[in-house]
Amino acid sequence: MHKSKKPIGFWSAVSMGIGAMVGAGIFALLGEASAISGSAVYISFIIGGIIALFSGYSLGKLGARYPSSGGIIEYLSQSYGVGIFTGTMGVMLYFAAIVSLSLIAKAFGNYAVTFLPETEKLKVWQIFFSSGVIVLLVLINLEGAKDVALLERVTVGIKFAVLTGLSIAGIIFLNPDLLSPSHYPPGNDIFFSLAITFFAFEGFRVITNTAEDMPNPSQTLPRAIMAAILLVMLLYVAIAFAVFGNLPVEKVIAAKDFALAEAALPIFGQVGFSVVAITALIATASSINANLYAATNVTYQLAKDGELPSAFGKPIAHSREGLLVSGVLIIALSLLFDLSEIAAIGSISILFVHTVTHIGHLKIISETGASRILIFIAALLSFSAMVLAIIYVSKASSHVLYILSGFILVALITEVSLRKIAKREIKTRVI
């Protein structure tokens, strides 16, 4: 088992989970989600949070029994054994993580350009900032797990302080009429928005990748996952009330690339806009930081088990070569997709992997000691949310389904190809 000399404790793990979730959830996707569910987006966040809690319970139990830096990849190996199916799911999970990071990097660039004069807000600057933050955080992650955890504790503290302040002020000054159910869209749209809002929670899985760096993962891992999801769900709901209680839906959608900063304008003026925009930069950087740690652990696990060439698992400085490969892929993908497409592809992919993981958990539930009913509910909720997301995407952006199909096909082809390159077999952990 790979062990870091710099262990990760409960609060460090919680901070990493929060950092991974909040960057994508509020700063990158609030505007996109509001375009579907309007001022009822808080309901969608609650539903997405409930699904995440059940998934978190399942992954927490698996992680307690099979602590591994590979997280879900290890759980799939234990449930389904070795083979092309498990390997394809692992490659798909890695690709989904890279796509997610490209979304967050793009969000960082969107907020960064708000500080430029109107005449200088060119696409080239958005690309520059998006790529630059990836390069910087790859270098930071090369220093090892403790440095990642330390940065998360600092950034999460700043982020929570500003967002809590904005939430409290927004709720104090909110206009109840703006939150009236009469402004809500049809109920179907609220459920369809799960295609976006669940993606706001999917970052919690990065906590599973810290298991090998935890002194006592059997106790720390499950508690850290549940704590992170609950705190983030409360934060999302509070912010949704604050934003939509002060801005009409149309304004939120119009400023969807920097919706939270726009929401601060009527309460705090231009200073508030700038403070929230700076916080957005910190939050998205924090999310990239936490997710990069997970991505490099995924490549390590894949390389260790023979799914990627061994070069991916070679240490560079205090981290792994897979981190550098991931950084290059993230920058490339951030240039190819827009936010809504990335969110839909990422959300459906992750929900599919979660569904498969929970079903597999039922096969080995005697090993983990989890509740069969709760795991069944986790699988059912993940599957239902995935179906709803597919239905919505097929109506709103049918071309995304073709991209998603291609995404799965590429994962399968990559898996088969890498097996030939690596010339090794996957071996599950023996515990």
Q: Each predicted region: which residue ranges?
A:
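Select transmembrane alpha-helical segments in multipass membrane proteins
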Residues: P7-G17, I50, G81-A96, F129-V133, ...
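Membrane-interface loop-to-helix entry segments
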Residues: A112, W125-F173, Y184-G187, I225-M226, ...
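Hydrophobic transmembrane alpha-helices that form the core helical bundles
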Residues: E32-I36, S44, L53-I134, V138-L142, ...
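Helix-loop-helix junctions that connect adjacent transmembrane segments
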Residues: M1-S4, Y42, T119-I127, R153-A277, ...
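A generic transmembrane alpha-helix motif of multi-pass inner-membrane proteins
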Residues: L362-S366, A370-I431
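Membrane-interface "cap" regions at the ends of multi-pass membrane proteins
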Residues: M1-G31, I36-S39, L53-Y57, V416-I431
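TM-loop-TM module centered on a large, flexible mid-protein loop between adjacent transmembrane helices
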Residues: I72-V82, T114-E118, M226-N289, E307-L339
